[in-house]
Protein backbone atom coordinates (compact mmCIF):
# COMPACT_ATOMS: atom_id res chain seq x y z
CA UNK A 1 0.00 0.00 0.00
CA UNK A 2 1.36 3.42 -0.92
CA UNK A 3 1.47 6.08 1.79
CA UNK A 4 2.99 9.56 2.09
CA UNK A 5 3.89 11.32 5.30
CA UNK A 6 6.51 13.82 6.36
CA UNK A 7 9.98 13.00 7.69
CA UNK A 8 9.08 14.80 10.93
CA UNK A 9 9.58 12.81 14.15
CA UNK A 10 5.89 12.57 15.00
CA UNK A 11 5.07 10.92 11.66
CA UNK A 12 8.03 8.54 11.61
CA UNK A 13 7.36 7.62 15.25
CA UNK A 14 3.68 6.90 14.54
CA UNK A 15 4.25 4.83 11.41
CA UNK A 16 7.55 3.13 12.31
CA UNK A 17 5.98 -0.17 13.35
CA UNK A 18 3.71 -0.44 10.32
CA UNK A 19 6.45 0.67 7.91
CA UNK A 20 8.73 -2.03 9.31
CA UNK A 21 6.27 -4.91 9.07
CA UNK A 22 5.56 -5.11 12.80
CA UNK A 23 1.76 -4.86 12.62
CA UNK A 24 0.13 -8.25 12.19
CA UNK A 25 -2.18 -8.44 9.19
CA UNK A 26 -1.30 -4.98 7.89
CA UNK A 27 -0.18 -4.63 4.26
CA UNK A 28 3.40 -3.72 3.43
CA UNK A 29 3.90 0.03 3.11
CA UNK A 30 5.57 1.80 0.21
CA UNK A 31 6.48 5.08 1.92
CA UNK A 32 7.05 8.45 0.27
CA UNK A 33 8.45 11.16 2.56
CA UNK A 34 7.03 14.50 1.50
CA UNK A 35 6.55 17.97 2.91
CA UNK A 36 2.91 18.64 3.76
CA UNK A 37 2.64 21.34 1.10
CA UNK A 38 3.38 18.63 -1.46
CA UNK A 39 0.82 16.17 -0.08
CA UNK A 40 -1.79 18.94 0.12
CA UNK A 41 -1.22 19.55 -3.58
CA UNK A 42 -1.37 15.87 -4.46
CA UNK A 43 -4.66 15.44 -2.62
CA UNK A 44 -6.16 18.50 -4.32
CA UNK A 45 -5.34 16.97 -7.72
CA UNK A 46 -6.34 13.43 -6.74
CA UNK A 47 -2.74 12.35 -7.25
CA UNK A 48 -0.10 10.69 -5.10
CA UNK A 49 -0.36 7.69 -2.76
CA UNK A 50 -3.77 6.42 -1.69
CA UNK A 51 -3.06 7.24 1.97
CA UNK A 52 -1.49 10.58 2.92
CA UNK A 53 -0.87 13.00 5.75
CA UNK A 54 -2.29 16.42 4.84
CA UNK A 55 -3.24 19.62 6.63
CA UNK A 56 -6.70 19.75 8.18
CA UNK A 57 -7.07 23.05 6.34
CA UNK A 58 -6.84 21.14 3.04
CA UNK A 59 -9.55 18.66 4.01
CA UNK A 60 -12.62 20.58 2.76
CA UNK A 61 -11.10 20.65 -0.73
CA UNK A 62 -10.78 16.86 -0.93
CA UNK A 63 -13.51 15.28 1.23
CA UNK A 64 -15.41 14.10 -1.83
CA UNK A 65 -12.41 11.97 -2.85
CA UNK A 66 -10.79 11.12 0.48
CA UNK A 67 -12.03 9.88 3.85
CA UNK A 68 -10.60 11.09 7.16
CA UNK A 69 -8.85 8.34 9.13
CA UNK A 70 -9.73 9.18 12.76
CA UNK A 71 -6.24 8.53 14.13
CA UNK A 72 -2.55 8.92 13.31
CA UNK A 73 -2.63 12.68 12.81
CA UNK A 74 -1.62 15.72 14.84
CA UNK A 75 -4.12 17.47 17.10
CA UNK A 76 -3.63 18.70 20.62
CA UNK A 77 -3.11 21.53 23.06
CA UNK A 78 -0.07 23.75 23.50
CA UNK A 79 1.22 22.81 20.06
CA UNK A 80 0.04 25.64 17.84
CA UNK A 81 1.97 27.45 15.11
CA UNK A 82 4.00 30.53 16.07
CA UNK A 83 4.46 33.90 14.37
CA UNK A 84 8.12 34.92 14.66
CA UNK A 85 10.02 38.09 13.81
CA UNK A 86 13.68 39.04 13.90
CA UNK A 87 14.53 41.07 16.99
CA UNK A 88 17.01 41.84 19.73
CA UNK A 89 16.15 38.76 21.76
CA UNK A 90 13.79 35.82 21.92
CA UNK A 91 10.62 36.22 23.91
CA UNK A 92 9.80 32.76 25.18
CA UNK A 93 6.23 31.47 25.27
CA UNK A 94 6.20 31.92 29.05
CA UNK A 95 7.12 35.59 28.70
CA UNK A 96 4.30 36.15 26.23
CA UNK A 97 1.42 34.42 28.01
CA UNK A 98 2.55 33.99 31.61
CA UNK A 99 2.54 30.20 31.41
CA UNK A 100 5.40 27.81 31.96
CA UNK A 101 7.77 27.46 29.03
CA UNK A 102 7.08 24.35 26.91
CA UNK A 103 10.62 23.02 27.25
CA UNK A 104 10.56 23.37 31.03
CA UNK A 105 7.18 21.64 31.24
CA UNK A 106 8.23 18.78 29.01
CA UNK A 107 11.60 18.47 30.75
CA UNK A 108 9.81 17.92 34.04
CA UNK A 109 7.60 15.28 32.45
CA UNK A 110 10.29 13.36 30.61
CA UNK A 111 13.46 13.98 32.57
CA UNK A 112 15.25 15.19 29.43
CA UNK A 113 17.20 18.40 29.87
CA UNK A 114 19.31 20.65 27.71
CA UNK A 115 16.74 22.57 25.71
CA UNK A 116 16.41 26.35 26.18
CA UNK A 117 13.87 27.40 28.78
CA UNK A 118 12.47 30.73 29.87
CA UNK A 119 15.28 31.27 32.31
CA UNK A 120 18.12 30.28 30.03
CA UNK A 121 20.52 32.44 28.09
CA UNK A 122 18.33 31.96 25.02
CA UNK A 123 15.50 33.83 26.70
CA UNK A 124 15.26 37.57 27.15
CA UNK A 125 12.13 38.48 29.05
CA UNK A 126 12.49 42.21 28.42
CA UNK A 127 13.11 41.87 24.70
CA UNK A 128 11.09 43.90 22.25
CA UNK A 129 10.92 43.87 18.49
CA UNK A 130 9.19 46.00 15.89
CA UNK A 131 6.80 43.12 15.21
CA UNK A 132 5.44 42.66 18.74
CA UNK A 133 2.35 44.68 17.77
CA UNK A 134 0.42 42.50 15.28
CA UNK A 135 -0.60 45.62 13.37
CA UNK A 136 3.05 45.96 12.35
CA UNK A 137 2.52 43.05 9.96
CA UNK A 138 0.08 44.94 7.75
CA UNK A 139 1.59 45.25 4.28
CA UNK A 140 4.74 43.32 5.23
CA UNK A 141 5.88 39.90 4.03
CA UNK A 142 5.21 36.73 6.03
CA UNK A 143 6.53 33.29 5.08
CA UNK A 144 4.16 30.35 5.66
CA UNK A 145 4.69 26.59 5.17
CA UNK A 146 1.70 26.17 2.85
CA UNK A 147 -1.22 28.29 1.75
CA UNK A 148 -3.44 25.31 2.57
CA UNK A 149 -1.82 24.46 5.88
CA UNK A 150 -3.74 24.51 9.13
CA UNK A 151 -1.08 26.88 10.42
CA UNK A 152 -1.96 29.36 7.68
CA UNK A 153 -5.69 28.91 8.24
CA UNK A 154 -5.26 29.69 11.95
CA UNK A 155 -3.10 32.66 10.98
CA UNK A 156 -5.83 33.98 8.66
CA UNK A 157 -8.47 33.70 11.39
CA UNK A 158 -6.14 35.36 13.92
CA UNK A 159 -5.10 38.11 11.50
CA UNK A 160 -8.72 38.99 10.77
CA UNK A 161 -9.05 39.90 14.46
CA UNK A 162 -5.60 41.30 15.14
CA UNK A 163 -4.42 43.15 12.00
CA UNK A 164 -6.91 45.95 11.26
CA UNK A 165 -4.75 47.33 8.44
CA UNK A 166 -5.22 44.22 6.33
CA UNK A 167 -3.38 40.99 5.67
CA UNK A 168 0.37 40.96 5.01
CA UNK A 169 1.91 39.69 1.81
CA UNK A 170 2.29 35.91 1.93
CA UNK A 171 5.06 33.74 0.49
CA UNK A 172 5.19 29.94 0.76
CA UNK A 173 8.46 28.32 1.84
CA UNK A 174 9.34 24.81 3.06
CA UNK A 175 8.99 25.00 6.83
CA UNK A 176 12.71 24.36 7.46
CA UNK A 177 13.59 27.45 5.36
CA UNK A 178 11.31 29.87 7.19
CA UNK A 179 13.40 30.69 10.27
CA UNK A 180 16.60 31.30 8.27
CA UNK A 181 14.61 33.57 5.93
CA UNK A 182 13.32 35.63 8.88
CA UNK A 183 16.76 35.76 10.47
CA UNK A 184 18.40 36.86 7.22
CA UNK A 185 15.83 39.58 6.52
CA UNK A 186 14.42 37.92 3.40
CA UNK A 187 10.94 38.14 4.94
CA UNK A 188 9.57 40.25 7.79
CA UNK A 189 8.02 37.41 9.77
CA UNK A 190 7.47 33.69 9.61
CA UNK A 191 4.72 31.29 10.57
CA UNK A 192 6.44 28.20 11.94
CA UNK A 193 5.44 24.72 13.06
CA UNK A 194 6.88 21.58 14.62
CA UNK A 195 10.28 21.74 16.32
CA UNK A 196 10.61 25.47 15.64
CA UNK A 197 8.66 25.87 18.89
CA UNK A 198 11.78 24.64 20.67
CA UNK A 199 14.57 25.98 18.46
CA UNK A 200 13.61 29.48 17.32
CA UNK A 201 15.74 31.22 20.00
CA UNK A 202 18.82 29.72 18.34
CA UNK A 203 18.03 31.88 15.29
CA UNK A 204 17.74 35.04 17.39
CA UNK A 205 14.04 35.30 16.64
CA UNK A 206 11.24 36.80 18.71
CA UNK A 207 7.81 35.39 19.39
CA UNK A 208 4.99 37.67 18.26
CA UNK A 209 2.01 35.36 18.72
CA UNK A 210 1.10 31.75 19.42
CA UNK A 211 -1.80 30.67 17.20
CA UNK A 212 -2.56 27.75 19.49
CA UNK A 213 -2.85 29.91 22.58
CA UNK A 214 -5.18 32.23 20.67
CA UNK A 215 -7.32 29.37 19.30
CA UNK A 216 -7.63 27.58 22.65
CA UNK A 217 -8.55 30.82 24.46
CA UNK A 218 -11.08 31.68 21.76
CA UNK A 219 -12.74 28.26 21.51
CA UNK A 220 -11.65 26.06 24.41
CA UNK A 221 -10.90 23.34 21.87
CA UNK A 222 -7.67 21.54 20.90
CA UNK A 223 -5.85 22.53 17.72
CA UNK A 224 -6.30 20.37 14.59
CA UNK A 225 -3.07 20.35 12.59
CA UNK A 226 -2.42 17.29 10.41
CA UNK A 227 -4.85 14.61 9.20
CA UNK A 228 -4.44 11.13 7.76
CA UNK A 229 -6.66 10.59 4.72
CA UNK A 230 -7.38 7.64 2.43
CA UNK A 231 -9.04 7.41 -0.95
CA UNK A 232 -12.74 6.74 -0.62
CA UNK A 233 -13.57 3.10 -1.20
CA UNK A 234 -10.67 1.88 0.94
CA UNK A 235 -11.36 -0.02 4.17
CA UNK A 236 -11.29 2.85 6.69
CA UNK A 237 -11.98 0.52 9.61
CA UNK A 238 -8.95 -1.62 8.79
CA UNK A 239 -6.74 1.42 8.14
CA UNK A 240 -7.79 2.82 11.51
CA UNK A 241 -7.04 -0.46 13.26
CA UNK A 242 -3.57 -0.77 11.70
CA UNK A 243 -2.69 2.87 12.39
CA UNK A 244 -3.80 2.62 16.01
CA UNK A 245 -1.76 -0.56 16.41
CA UNK A 246 1.29 1.27 15.07
CA UNK A 247 0.77 4.15 17.51
CA UNK A 248 0.36 1.77 20.43
CA UNK A 249 3.47 -0.18 19.42
CA UNK A 250 5.43 3.07 19.28
CA UNK A 251 4.35 4.04 22.79
CA UNK A 252 5.06 0.56 24.17
CA UNK A 253 8.49 0.38 22.48
CA UNK A 254 9.79 3.96 22.18
CA UNK A 255 13.41 2.90 21.68
CA UNK A 256 12.51 0.73 18.68
CA UNK A 257 11.78 3.71 16.44
CA UNK A 258 14.68 5.91 17.58
CA UNK A 259 17.04 5.09 14.69
CA UNK A 260 14.28 5.47 12.09
CA UNK A 261 13.12 8.76 13.59
CA UNK A 262 16.62 10.18 13.72
CA UNK A 263 17.43 9.05 10.17
CA UNK A 264 14.78 11.38 8.79
CA UNK A 265 15.02 14.13 11.39
CA UNK A 266 17.72 15.90 9.36
CA UNK A 267 19.89 17.93 11.75
CA UNK A 268 17.47 17.81 14.68
CA UNK A 269 19.05 16.63 17.92
CA UNK A 270 17.67 13.46 19.55
CA UNK A 271 16.49 15.56 22.49
CA UNK A 272 14.48 17.92 20.30
CA UNK A 273 13.07 14.93 18.39
CA UNK A 274 11.86 13.44 21.67
CA UNK A 275 10.21 16.69 22.69
CA UNK A 276 8.64 16.95 19.25
CA UNK A 277 7.13 13.48 19.63
CA UNK A 278 5.99 14.20 23.18
CA UNK A 279 4.10 17.29 22.05
CA UNK A 280 2.53 16.10 18.81
CA UNK A 281 1.83 12.41 19.52
CA UNK A 282 -0.93 12.15 22.11
CA UNK A 283 -4.32 10.57 22.78
CA UNK A 284 -5.79 12.40 19.80
CA UNK A 285 -3.22 10.60 17.65
CA UNK A 286 -4.53 7.25 18.85
CA UNK A 287 -8.14 8.34 18.38
CA UNK A 288 -9.70 11.68 17.49
CA UNK A 289 -12.74 10.90 19.59
CA UNK A 290 -15.67 13.27 19.89
CA UNK A 291 -13.56 16.14 21.27
CA UNK A 292 -11.16 15.90 18.36
CA UNK A 293 -13.92 15.75 15.78
CA UNK A 294 -15.65 18.76 17.39
CA UNK A 295 -12.38 20.69 17.12
CA UNK A 296 -12.06 19.80 13.43
CA UNK A 297 -15.69 20.70 12.74
CA UNK A 298 -15.29 24.00 14.61
CA UNK A 299 -12.13 25.08 12.80
CA UNK A 300 -13.26 24.11 9.32
CA UNK A 301 -16.84 25.27 9.83
CA UNK A 302 -15.64 28.66 11.03
CA UNK A 303 -13.21 28.94 8.14
CA UNK A 304 -15.91 27.97 5.64
CA UNK A 305 -18.31 30.56 7.05
CA UNK A 306 -15.64 33.24 6.50
CA UNK A 307 -14.92 32.07 2.96
CA UNK A 308 -11.44 30.77 3.73
CA UNK A 309 -12.18 27.18 2.67
CA UNK A 310 -15.00 25.67 0.58
CA UNK A 311 -18.26 24.80 2.30
CA UNK A 312 -18.50 21.08 3.06
CA UNK A 313 -20.83 18.49 4.55
CA UNK A 314 -19.66 17.85 8.16
CA UNK A 315 -21.08 14.32 7.91
CA UNK A 316 -18.25 13.50 5.49
CA UNK A 317 -15.77 13.88 8.35
CA UNK A 318 -17.30 10.75 9.89
CA UNK A 319 -17.98 8.77 6.73
Outline where the language-model segments fall:
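Bilobed "Venus flytrap"/periplasmic-binding protein-like clamshell domains
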Residues: 2-20, 34, 81, 85-98, ...
Amino acid sequence: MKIAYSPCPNDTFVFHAWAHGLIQGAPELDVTYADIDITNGWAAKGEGPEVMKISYAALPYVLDQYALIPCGGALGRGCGPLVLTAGGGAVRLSDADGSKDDNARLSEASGVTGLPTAGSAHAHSGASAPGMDPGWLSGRTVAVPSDRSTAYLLFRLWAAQQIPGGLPNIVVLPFHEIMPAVRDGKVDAGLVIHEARFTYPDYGLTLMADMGTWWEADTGLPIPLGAIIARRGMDVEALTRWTQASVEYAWANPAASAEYVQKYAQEMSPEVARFHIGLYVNEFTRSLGEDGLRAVESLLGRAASEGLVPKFDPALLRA
